């Protein structure tokens, strides 16, 4: 689960991480009230959306007067923000963050992330802050230091010495940097964070390290342990079908293809995406109905996939061990019989009650094609999608 910047800063502030003052407003009236109370005459105004690239795509405005701040608030609130990270077209801007301008001496990058290569959390540091870290990693990998942490977020003294030397922090700045890194690691571990990114971390002209921008992602599977974080979920920042899938208890991820997929089991679902790609097609979604889905959940799954207008073909790939094929068939038929236009459907059923499942579909008269293997099904689905 992604947090907005202001939510990430709220969480970091609870660990005494140094952050400049900031305010969040959701209307022009709130902006006017803030200016009146605070006397702000210069600030940076930033859209609050779950996407990067805000500065490059008009989502950040530097205002150098009170009137300029209000104009920025009016311009940004309600906009449809788009960047290279908004795959579904745009994200609505319902809130903006306002923070005073800071006199910057130098910018840094600091992050704690889960790293598959090291199979543990890692601390990443770079003196090339304020930039696209992916570009830095590609063009100048020597500018990034990666230090593996323990699974419980501990960082050793020798690693702290490595970090401060690499970042060229000395004296009081070194002390600030050490404390900051410890706090970030603690926040990461205690809140089941999968990504904690500070970009930029700045050194001010007064010699103070401050977090200017932050990004935090929480492990969805651990949210039950953090009710204080679970309530921060913002459905407006997600694909409508993603939100609906969460409500009905399905594992769904929207993709960019035109072949709708309904599969049981995450492994089989991933394999289905791969084999479609192998045959020249592209899946419109990842959807795992699991092993114990009810007929109602199957109906909801079919309706969910078909609500995507880009879907030209439906590929159902079920290997029924725990899953009952007749339940899948009944759910499919219940939805298809209510639709004016039926999407071409390719079905591969194997396992528990497979013959009964096929009989239910065939007796309904809905247009579909049964196949005997995933390979054959993928090939046929791709042909129909062209």
From Swiss-Prot:
Occurrences of domain ATP-grasp (ranges): 9-244
Manganese recorded as keyword: no
Cofactor binding, note field: Binds 1 Mg(2+) ion per subunit.
InterPro entries, sorted: ATP-grasp (IPR011761), ATP-grasp_succ-CoA_synth-type (IPR013650), ATP_grasp_subdomain_1 (IPR013815), Succ-CoA_synthase_bsu_CS (IPR017866), SUCC_ACL_C (IPR005811), Succ_CoA_ligase-like_bsu (IPR005809), Succinyl-CoA_synth-like (IPR016102)
Record's GO cellular component terms: cytosol; succinate-CoA ligase complex
Keywords: ATP-binding, Ligase, Magnesium, Metal-binding, Nucleotide-binding, Tricarboxylic acid cycle
GO biological processes: succinyl-CoA metabolic process; tricarboxylic acid cycle
Pathway: Carbohydrate metabolism; tricarboxylic acid cycle; succinate from succinyl-CoA (ligase route): step 1/1
Catalytic activity: succinate + ATP + CoA = succinyl-CoA + ADP + phosphate; GTP + succinate + CoA = succinyl-CoA + GDP + phosphate
SUPFAM superfamilies recorded: Glutathione synthetase ATP-binding domain-like (SSF56059), Succinyl-CoA synthetase domains (SSF52210)
Cofactor: Mg(2+)
Binding site for Mg(2+): 199, 213
Superkingdom of this protein's organism: Bacteria
Binding site residues for ATP: 46, 53-55, 102, 107
Molecular function as annotated in GO: ATP binding; magnesium ion binding; succinate-CoA ligase (ADP-forming) activity; succinate-CoA ligase (GDP-forming) activity
Binding site for substrate: 264, 321-323
Spans through the membrane: none
EC number: 6.2.1.5
Function in brief: Succinyl-CoA synthetase functions in the citric acid cycle (TCA), coupling the hydrolysis of succinyl-CoA to the synthesis of either ATP or GTP and thus represents the only step of substrate-level phosphorylation in the TCA. The beta subunit provides nucleotide specificity of the enzyme and binds the substrate succinate, while the binding sites for coenzyme A and phosphate are found in the alpha subunit.
Subunit structure, interactors included: Heterotetramer of two alpha and two beta subunits.
Family assignment from sequence similarity: Belongs to the succinate/malate CoA ligase beta subunit family.
Protein name: Succinate--CoA ligase [ADP-forming] subunit beta
Organism: Chlamydia pneumoniae (Chlamydophila pneumoniae)
Gene expressing this chain: sucC
